[in-house]
Structures are given as structure tokens and as C-alpha cells.
Amino acid sequence: NDPKENAEHVMLVDLARNDLSRNCHGVKVDFYKDMQFYSHVIHLVSRVSGTLDQDADHIKEFIDTFPAGTLSGAPKVRAMQIISELEPHNRGAYGGCIGFIGLNGDLNQAIVIRTFISRNGELWFQAGSGVVAKSNDQYELEECNNKLGALTKAIHIAEKL
């Protein structure tokens, strides 16, 4: 029932609808604000879908929707510019995607979040939160720490092996 979290979710669903509408028709929200429970976090989840226009293809749709609004915010281009200005390091794989493009044109991808990245003998993992004008700094930090909870637990378990 947090007004900030609800407003953030509404913004993200609207952004997804807008992104899909570039190359799809019949864009709709299949389900809205379902709660999904994980070991360290609870997420509001909505699914937005559409039917690809005849003159569009999976690759164009991917390009037009990437990065996901959940990692960029809105307005997407300006939010990404601000992220680039403020964040001290390039995000690397975080917020990118992993997946495949089939020879038949099929495309399946997932956003890289809550993932370990091993680089030059160092292990990296990242999390973020939706920071807006009415955000509570402490709550946003707590959200990031909660999101990293499962990865942190995995490190502690691995240290005992």
C-alpha cells in the first residue's frame, strides 16, 4: 500500500505499454499488480503483451524496448543520461540481457539482475531501486540490500564449503 511503490509500478506498466505499442497492436495488461514472494523480497508483477505488427520483427521490437523500464526509469532516454552522469561505474552486464535469437527469428531474453559477474578475479553483484523525488533514502538502501540478500547468503554458504 506504499503510494511511492504503487506510483512507480504504474509508471513502469505505462512505459511497457508505450514501448510495445511501437511495433505491436492489441497491447494489453494481462495481469496487474500480482504479488510474487521470493526468499528476500516481494515484487509487484504485471504482464503487458501485444501482437507483433506484420511489418515489425522480433529484433526491432527488442531494440525499441531495451533497456527495460524497470532498469532505466522514465522518461527512458533522459533517465539513462542521468544514470550515466551519476553512476561512478559502467553497469557492465547488470541491467543488460542474456538470451538467444533463433535462426527462425525467435527471440528470448532475460534481464541480468541479481547475478554474480566474475571479472579480473573479483566477484561483482549489483542491485538498484526506483529513486524518485519522494523516495526515502534509507528505505531505498534497504530495498537494495534485500534484493542482494539471496546472493549474499550464497556467498556465506560458499565460504563454509
Model-derived features: positions:
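Extended alpha-helical targeting/anchoring segments
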Residues: 1-161
